[in-house]
Amino acid sequence: MIEKILSILLDEDKAKGIHYLFRYRKHVDFLKTIYTNFKYFPISDALKFPIVIGKNTDIKLGSIKFNCPIKPSLVRLGTQPIPVIEDGFSRLVVKNSGTIEIGGLFICQTGVKILIREGAVFSVADKVKFGHLSKVVCHKKISIGNDFRMSWECQIFDTDFHFVYN
């Protein structure tokens, strides 16, 4: 019903974006979602709400680039809590000092930590999902292809943090 009314007022993509926000309203932080979309995109794209941010998140997106057409809810950060673990309210953290490249649907469940160092590139293709409490640390470049799912509490690093001096 809501989607039909919105589709009359707005084009289909914008109506779907707003409908997603209302569908998951218990888990979406509306202020962060609206602020982030209008900060990073022109108004016509921001109204599609390509980035949806859940409650209990700490996000610094830095540079973000879409390598695909912008659609509603392409990036879902912490909007799908896991009730089995900690009532699904573990803090999701994204600290991006580099560049994030998005190639399609990208979902992070609650508790995920993504840290991207200055000058580093973290790129994901279409249909990528990170499970609860997973970690990604990118110092140079991490590239993830299509149809990738990472289970709970997994880690991806492109460094071992052991530095060698001459």
What are the functions of these language-model segments?
Residues 1-157:
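Domain-scale signature associated with acetyltransferase and cell-envelope carbohydrate enzymes
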Residues 79-80, 161-166:
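Acidic/polar low-complexity surface segments
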